[in-house]
């Protein structure tokens, strides 16, 4: 079924929306008048789950047909031209965090409810009839009445104009897409401030949280708006910017224009006990959503195939913004650790979607929001483009883009045109190969007969069909005398020895600062030279060596045994970035290590030796004035040291737990998950799991909740695991938004994996009903694909999911997961013996 475009028959100009919402009955009564241009005598509007009592056109009752399968109502208006079509209807609050839905929480044991909205991507139709397409921009006059109680407030995209007999009337919005309309009502507390330009900024949350938890997000929001106004040279166009933390939320956050909504863990920060990682995460999420107020809201993609125009740029700009506001955080290191790593891994599987991808079925719209591609890869491409253009031209091009297309819709070439006009470079020619093609290249660098040969070829992990794709690869080398771009399959540069002398004999490396989306396979002396200088290289280059060698091993280009052999080169590293690279590599090597084997003992010894110096340097206690990098690194070092069975570390972890056992939340946040995990591993106590679960239910600290989720999943007790799995059906214990994470923690552990997998299969109907429209739904397809590593599990996965391939919302994820598991099984079979030997040998030598 092709995607039907309703804007082709009706172009909306204005919506007048009145909603009467009753929380107790969960009923909605709606009246909507849509004024616009009818291009046909029969027009259609999107609708889902709405029950219509009356439809009028030209002030006369008219016939209509409700087409549930196509999610539309067909209205016979009899004439073309400007018309107002009005609807009276009834609906119910949804129960899957889409449309208009309830959020549940408790304050001092009393259960309460907030009402919020989530209309992206195409869920406005569950709240009111509409042309629910991004191109169909219009203004909105919103009025809401609800069962208001003392202490309740309501907020929306625009300021409240007046309150007439309990009807809250909001100012008319600017011209915008339907998916950006939003409102929230209930008992909320808030703090407010103003930007230098006079924009009112507010942070809102339920009273389940300390009001002080609003201070950090409010400060970040104010400073981010000020940064973007300056960087984009385009004023923030609305009178206010509200930021609301919702107890139940499908995604991380949503960029509703002027009324941004968040999952609580993505916005609120415990002022007394928060990690630097938590602050950085919250700050980048807020900066991401505020970047959208220009990229996505002011200028919106014409159709969902250009979703990357929203998400790729917002993902890039969150780092640009935070690097400017908090330079000591070194957020570009975090970018390499998370975004680059995620993109390189996902994008190496044949069949992955491109950044720009055609939408041929309505159910495919939700699949576009692939965090590894549209967000991570797309932002990596924008980082590459910004470096290629230079920051000044990049920013000036964006300013021109906003000026030219504000309140309108665009396609990718509109952005390339603006950047090209400012920079004088052919941006479209440079970017098309990256945005329109899936995958990325491996650049092979080798010297043959004094000739440096650089060649590119699409990189695959697992089986892949080479279609001869080529990219415009920015070499970004540390040497002079080499070309800027590799656009052909191969380039040969003679006189390598002389060229090396000209560059003072230093080792050659490509992709400086890890800013372009490719990896490098250095052959022979080129790799030897690079490793010989490893201590003097920039931290990001060291990280790249680990990143690229790991991926080459994963693809079978080299052996993981080869990668194990370079580990001794990194024993003296104090950098958070480099040690994270080591940690990621260790996680990959764990695939080959059988539990309770001699190889595991050798591997534990090796890991302990790799992190011994940093354990001695950092210890357990935060030091006043220490860097953000050291604070972040401590958790990695302690985790790996405990994995190595270090007696001192295990004793210290148990002592810290004992000192805080009456108030587990008071454990210093930077070491808290380490301590919680260790106690479960050490005691394997069902009673301790019970304590953790009771604490989980009572606490309002979302980061702490996530830590407790991870810790209880480490239990090795079949009865307790069964109880944990069954609790996922009880929303009073585990909220639907958290089921996927909680379940994954059990799936990834060998002891509980079979039980978690069996639970998913037995409860698929429950997951479909509860999470079918939710952004976490396909995680139950993706997570097993990221985890399973045996032929038996591959067969079971196929048997369960292949019959579901007709579900267009899951199809690509299922196909990708099968390829990933197949590749992982083959990799372990082919390399395990060599890797086990290398681990044993290096552990003895180190």
Swiss-Prot record:
A molecular function (GO) term: alanyl aminopeptidase activity
Main location group: cytoplasm
Family the UniProt entry places it in: Belongs to the peptidase M1 family.
E.C. number: 3.4.11.2
Names of required cofactors: Zn(2+)
Biological processes, Gene Ontology terms: peptide catabolic process; proteolysis
Name of the molecule in the record: Aminopeptidase N
Binding site for Zn(2+): 288, 292, 311
